């Protein structure tokens, strides 16, 4: 038999990953594509999702604010890809970033540390990448039929709350119980 080396992933409390995905909804009977913001806390496996008409600076901010309210606090460190909403320029062969003014304001207001993935290395935030797919398949299938985005977002937030009641395989508590450790970190 062949042995394969592996590394157990260690997930620290108080860390988050952010990404956007896209899905189809029926808004007043019309099929529309929406952007959805996802913030994941890998330690507790807690997730927050909100849908917006598009991905832009305002929805990036609003997604953060709503997620912080839902989680009951601000993660100490958040990992991102190199979204133009946060990064205006990648410098020194990808080792440094020039941040947008809007992102610097968000960061200085909420006082979290940031981390950006290496260019074309989405696997560095693999938890949220996987969750974007999970959310698309489990929250947006079948295609939600809603009168407005407020109703959709209320439904998405309710689903996120329901997810907190689930127990993670190999863990002794629910996601909500592990979220308490995330909050204290």
Label the model's feature ranges.
Residues 132-185:
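Active-site-proximal acidic segments at structured loop/helix or strand boundaries
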Residues 86-90:
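Short, solvent-exposed loop/turn segments at secondary-structure junctions
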Residues 10-47, 55-62, 108:
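Mobile-element integrase/transposase regions
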Residues 2-9:
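Short, small-residue-biased leader/transition segments that mark boundaries at the very start
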């Amino acid at each position: 038999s062949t042995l394969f080396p592996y590394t157990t992933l260690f997930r620290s409390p108080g860390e988050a990953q952010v990404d956007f995905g896209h899905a189809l909804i029926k808004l007043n009977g019309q099929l529309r594509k929406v952007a959805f913001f996802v913030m994941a806390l890998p330690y507790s496996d807690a997730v927050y999702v909100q849908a917006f008409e598009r991905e832009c600076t305002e929805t990036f901010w609003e997604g953060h604010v709503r997620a912080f309210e839902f989680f009951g606090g601000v993660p100490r460190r958040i990992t991102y890809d190199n979204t133009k909403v946060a990064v205006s320029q990648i410098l020194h062969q990808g080792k440094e970033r020039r941040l947008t003014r809007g992102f610097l304001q968000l960061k200085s207001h909420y006082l979290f540390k940031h981390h950006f993935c290496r260019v074309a290395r989405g696997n560095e935030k693999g938890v949220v990448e996987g969750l974007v797919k999970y959310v698309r398949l489990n929250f947006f299938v079948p295609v939600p039929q809603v009168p407005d985005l407020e109703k959709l977002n209320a439904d998405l937030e309710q689903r996120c709350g329901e997810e907190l009641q689930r127990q993670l395989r190999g863990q002794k508590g629910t996601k909500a119980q592990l979220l308490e450790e995330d909050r204290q970190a």
